[in-house]
């Protein structure tokens, strides 16, 4: 049975699963759908069209599904889709998409979005990502699975953050970050790979060693990107993890952080 505080405001068109909890002074607007087991804290504003999946928790003073401030936005119908088992901490802001891109901002499953983080319009967050306090993503940013963005990380629009990558505190990212790579600084520079994260997630010693060699080829041998990718072909055929690293470089449209 749902638990809706009498001080909350729920639009009649909103669709809430039977056991959803909504705290006092929260506002659930039109065209908002909330899945089972989700808890909405006090002083949260949800604006639609927004779909929120199962077993999420959204903490106080978050604004989820608001219009984008992009000056191209003229009120067209766009939406926000949030998956399952996400934690959205205090004061987070997440904007819906624009018709000039995907018309949708998307957040996957099992993500931790910490206090005062911002996710801009048309961004895509994968699964098992962590956005630490005050991280800010401009519009059209992609964050692949298991990426960790430390506090005060800033990401320029249209950048892609690769799977299992890691940014240090206060990093300003203006180019794509390949999978597994650790970046730090303003502007961001590649420092190493997220080997500790790989070990925690069960990567084999052989795969980690292969990725270490791959990183040195791209970043330490003085090769052009094209030359390094050619050198990676044999290792990528043997190790899927190296193939992911190579593919994330090949897919870059902004150039990679070096």
Swiss-Prot record:
Keyword Cell membrane: no
Cell compartment(s), UniProt: Cytoplasm
Superkingdom: Bacteria
Keyword Plastid annotated: no
Record CDD domains: LbH_UDP-GlcNAc_AT
GO biological process, one term: lipid A biosynthetic process
SUPFAM superfamilies cross-referenced by the UniProt entry: Trimeric LpxA-like enzymes (SSF51161)
Signal peptide coordinates: none
Keywords recorded for this protein, A-Z: Acyltransferase, Cytoplasm, Lipid A biosynthesis, Lipid biosynthesis, Lipid metabolism, Repeat, Transferase
Reaction catalyzed: a (3R)-hydroxyacyl-[ACP] + UDP-N-acetyl-alpha-D-glucosamine = a UDP-3-O-[(3R)-3-hydroxyacyl]-N-acetyl-alpha-D-glucosamine + holo-[ACP]
InterPro entries: Acetyltransf_C, Acetyltransf_C_sf, Hexapep, Hexapep_transf_CS, Lipid_A_LpxA, Trimer_LpxA-like_sf
One Pfam family per UniProt: Hexapep
One CC-aspect GO term: membrane
Functional pathway: Glycolipid biosynthesis; lipid IV(A) biosynthesis; lipid IV(A) from (3R)-3-hydroxytetradecanoyl-[acyl-carrier-protein] and UDP-N-acetyl-alpha-D-glucosamine: step 1/6
Gene Ontology molecular-function annotations: acyl-[acyl-carrier-protein]-UDP-N-acetylglucosamine O-acyltransferase activity
PROSITE patterns on file: HEXAPEP_TRANSFERASES
Major location (coarse): cytoplasm
Oligomer status and interactors: Homotrimer.
Job of this protein: Involved in the biosynthesis of lipid A, a phosphorylated glycolipid that anchors the lipopolysaccharide to the outer membrane of the cell.
Name of the featured protein: Acyl-[acyl-carrier-protein]--UDP-N-acetylglucosamine O-acyltransferase
Organism: Ectopseudomonas mendocina (strain ymp) (Pseudomonas mendocina)
